[in-house]
A protein has these predicted regions:
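Transmembrane beta-barrel wall of Gram-negative outer-membrane proteins
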Residues: 1-103, 127-134
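Generic structural motif recognizing short loop/turn segments at the entrances and edges of beta-strands
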Residues: 24-25, 117, 143-145
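Extracellular loop and loop/strand-boundary signature of outer-membrane beta-barrel proteins
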Residues: 58-65, 115-123, 135, 166
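Face-selective signature of the C-terminal outer-membrane beta-barrel domain
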Residues: 82-93, 97, 125-166
């Protein structure tokens, strides 16, 4: 297992709250993170076993070199407003991951793949999550009645951007 620079992790965070007139407050938070990780394996081995009577049988045996480049970025931001009459909060969360993989090796025909010999596999996959939680708490009749509202629209996607064999 070899690692190639630039494996890197960076993070930035900021938050604060402010007092306003008439016992009101407003606050914010923000966080940004980035990570990259590059790995290389000289002795990659893919092996799958199937249970067949009376013993386990090796059905796939591929060897070679594997390189992997993973990138991860996330952002979390939000604002809040509060007063005697209630509090409202909204946040925004974004997470994205990209992964590139390259394999150069010897591949054996296994029924799934009709190829015997030396070859290359290159792939790129990207995953993404977006979430926007909102909540509101309101007081009425001098605090005798409370009304709450919250919802969180969320979206997730997986993109198989690229897959090549040769």
């Amino acid at each position: 297992n070899k690692s190639s620079s630039p494996n890197l992790t960076l993070g930035f965070t900021s938050s604060n709250s402010y007092d306003l007139k008439n016992e009101r407050k407003v606050g914010y938070m923000a966080s940004l993170n980035y990570r990259s990780n590059i790995s290389y394996f000289d002795d990659y081995l893919e092996s799958r076993y199937e249970k067949s009577l009376p013993a386990f049988a090796n059905t796939v045996y591929n060897t070679g070199k594997l390189g992997k480049d993973e990138r991860f970025i996330s952002f979390l931001g939000g604002i809040a407003y509060g007063s005697k009459k209630g509090k409202q909060k909204i946040n925004f969360l974004f997470i994205q991951n990209g992964e590139s993989t390259a394999i150069q090796g010897d591949f054996l025909n296994n029924g799934e793949n009709n190829y015997d010999g030396v070859g290359q596999i290159k792939s790129y996959v990207q995953r993404q999550i977006i979430s926007i939680p909102f909540s509101s708490k309101n007081y009425f009749l001098d605090g005798k009645l409370e009304a709450n509202l919250s919802f969180t629209p969320s979206f997730s996607r997986v993109y198989d951007k690229d897959f090549k064999t040769s």
